[in-house]
């Protein structure tokens, strides 16, 4: 793909993303709707869970830079209608469970109830179908879902939004039963969920944005002690009909200013940045705001230059890639990931071959190459550091903040956010030409903090929670 195919693209030495031929081995996946990178076993490589709209769902393992399909299990759920995925350690055993949101935004009601798959041996069991879930009553299908550890205990709940009903926050109670804690948490508001994002938007606490596919959207400010207060109107987020499809809380100026980026199915995309009082102001530059039929969002440092890129996946029109250049978000050439005629549904980035460079996975409802597209980055060699914080139980600490200082400049990541699914639960930092990290700070959701200093680059660090036994940071075995 020539760089001239992207109007206004700045020169950076050629297209950034190159297509992998035969991305998936051992399975045909004609269509895909959601992606989740999950830790399905202790000390095992991350798996890529693929939601398939008409089943079966698949689990793929990275092998030699490609993706190898594992045998079908209960998670395949061939009669399901997967639309979104989330991954987190629900029961505190150090392994992540998978929530499958089986809602269909084109229908008032989903065809199939949601699932919560718990890895057991070589298979899975659906916790929502067991007697422990009886107190939940009927569990309808959802359109979007995110993990939420509201008490910082390492046991995550799942916050799910469906077709105009109240938000649900499904947690495991102290007796191993399941309950809906949304009312207790202050989250039981009505919404037709189209997008979710969690992070420290309005302060140091964990804030929750629920972008509505139709009707008013919600913004919950963390109030401490596992509770939230809805502040959309007072914070300046009163958009009557947002039409949200995906969202992320990101470093809006690559200098430490948090912002909320929301993609819309119609109308200009929006980037809200809070002022010192917590009032949000819309500040999307024209290059970012330009309307498109957006379906999914990815924010990651793809070329390891120390600045993140934004990939906007669009239905039936070219995908867009923006990079932070000359103190602003500028379009660059996505290369083979332009995909001008496909119908992308989700995007994820992960280091699948262990070389310190991210690969990009695009799920598609249709398009050339089937349901999964795999892309590698074509860019100059740069240094990097990858950080994998763990909960006290040893699972990925999704939602933790990781801040790095290298060459006098800081970068911050929120662990594990992803588009219509679960992102890689690793804080990936490009370092450009810098080979030494001065300082690394990790803040867990319970307020615990660890600092590591004078770290060499080009390595992955697993960082246990301070309360965990054997809490020294280490590289993967």
Model-derived features: where do they sit?
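Blade-edge motifs of beta-propeller repeat domains
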Residues: 1-31, 46-49, 58-80, 115-140, ...
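Gly/Ser/Thr/Pro-enriched helix-cap/hinge segments flanking short amphipathic alpha-helices
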Residues: 2-9, 24-28, 280-282, 290, ...
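Short coil/loop residues immediately preceding or within conserved phosphate-binding loops
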Residues: 32, 82, 111, 140-142, ...
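Beta-propeller blade termini
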Residues: 32-41, 46-47, 81-97, 141-151, ...
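Hydrophobic beta-strand segments that make up the repeating blades of beta-propeller
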Residues: 46-52, 98-102, 156-162, 206-212, ...
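Short, solvent-exposed loop/turn segments at conserved positions within beta-propeller repeat blades
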Residues: 54-55, 107-112, 162-165, 212-215, ...
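Loop/turn-rich, solvent-exposed surfaces of beta-rich toroidal or solenoidal domains
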Residues: 295-299, 303-316
